[in-house]
Amino acid sequence: MNKLSTKLVVAIGIGAALYGILGLWGFSIAPNTFIKPALAILTVFGALFGPVAGLLIGLIGHTVTDTIAGWGIWWGWVISSGIIGFAMGFIQKRVGFSVKNGTYNKGDISYLAITGLIGIVIAIIFAGAFDIIVMGEPFDKIVIQVLGATIADVIVFLVLGLPITIGLAKSNKKHAHLKIEK
């Protein structure tokens, strides 16, 4: 079994705390459904530290949000945050991609966009199905929540998560434009 490094454990702790606390704020768009800028944390930390970190940050962070908010832990949505974080982390496994070193290409950005969008859709559908099957929530309510949450998460991912991740990679890029004068 692979061991988690100290650096990865610390990153997971920081990411989960940020995601958990920032998850308390959002803009309501449907019943119990919000645009939450905290989703960008899953994109950035997933891209920096990989799918396992993204998964754990999503699971732990969402549990923190639900616990602090006091509305009870909604496990379907907790798991969906883990799925989203996991999907965002796939980019970190691509050869040649590194936010830390500023190495990426257009194919990497497309890959992150596609895996992120697929992860969001799968995760939100899972959460909705879980709420209907396990929690006994009404189908009509869940359809509205699933549509609202999917739209909200896609907006946050495309407007905040993706640009912040690209910006971090650009800021870490090693510039080779300098020439040594003789």
Swiss-Prot record:
GO terms for cellular component: plasma membrane. Coiled coil: none annotated. Pfam families: ECF-ribofla_trS. It comes from the Bacteria. The chain crosses the membrane at residues 9-29, 40-60, 71-91, 114-134, 142-162. Keywords: Cell membrane, Membrane, Transmembrane, Transmembrane helix. It is a multi-pass membrane protein. It is found in: Cell membrane. PANTHER family: UPF0397 PROTEIN BC_2624-RELATED (PTHR37815), UPF0397 PROTEIN SPR0429 (PTHR37815:SF3). Belongs to the UPF0397 family. NCBIfam families: PRK13661.1 (NF010182). This is UPF0397 protein BCQ_2505. It comes from Bacillus cereus (strain Q1).
